[in-house]
């Protein structure tokens, strides 16, 4: 079962629809966690949402409790939450990307996606990871081809993955394939 933690974002139900193509999905609001269902899940998805990662201490506790024990996937805010909990600094970026399509390039650090492959993604964010970012396990797996901003992460040791972009967006090429690849990792 996939447990999606909803950070009160309209894209969450698009994620529910996409992930339900691969497994049973349970979704609840971040402040109404069903602990029994969370424990039963094999994958936890941290959804997009408004604000900053520091606005969601409940989700940070869940991330830290289940990291290395269950597959964790972060989308947009969820991606930022993962990096924030790994001592990454999340900052306001110069340009805001809400409803923009950009090209991302897969980095040589990616073990799941074909190195140097480019594809279009849908972006809806005003925050980004400040670099340099140091981690023993988390690798930057994708970057914006134009700006170099990190757009994807992989931590194979702890089974943690994330995307700054929205794989469920109509602006993202092959979003279903991206989700399938992460779920089968």
What are these regions (language model features)?
Residues 2-21:
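Short, charged N-terminal beta->alpha structural module
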Residues 11, 127-130, 169-171:
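Active-site environment of divalent metal-dependent phosphoester hydrolases
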Residues 20-36:
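A short, well-structured beta->alpha microelement
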Residues 32-41, 133-134:
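Short amphipathic alpha-helix with an adjacent loop that forms part of the alpha/beta core around
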Residues 43-110, 120, 179:
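Cysteine-nucleophile active-site neighborhood
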Residues 76, 125, 166:
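Histidine-centered divalent metal-coordination motifs
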Residues 110-157:
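Catalytic beta-strand/loop cores that center a nucleophilic Ser/Cys/Thr
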Residues 167-185:
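Acyltransferase
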């Amino acid at each position: 079962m996939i447990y999606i933690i909803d950070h009160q974002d309209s894209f969450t139900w698009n994620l529910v629809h996409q992930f339900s193509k691969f497994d049973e999905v349970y979704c609840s609001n971040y402040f109404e966690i069903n602990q029994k269902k969370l424990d039963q899940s094999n994958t936890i998805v941290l959804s997009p949402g408004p604000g900053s990662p520091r606005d969601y201490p409940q989700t940070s506790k869940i991330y830290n409790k289940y990291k290395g024990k269950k597959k964790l996937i972060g989308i947009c805010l969820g991606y930022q939450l993962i990096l924030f909990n790994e001592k990454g600094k999340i900052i306001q970026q110069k340009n805001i990307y809400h409803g923009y399509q950009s090209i991302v390039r897969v980095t040589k650090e990616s073990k799941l996606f074909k190195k140097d492959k480019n594809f279009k993604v849908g972006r809806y964010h005003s925050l980004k990871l400040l670099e340099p970012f140091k981690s023993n396990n988390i690798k930057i797996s994708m970057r914006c081809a134009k700006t170099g901003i990190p757009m994807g992460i992989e931590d194979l040791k702890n089974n943690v993955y994330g995307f700054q972009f929205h794989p469920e967006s109509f602006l993202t090429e092959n979003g279903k394939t991206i989700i399938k690849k992460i779920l089968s990792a």
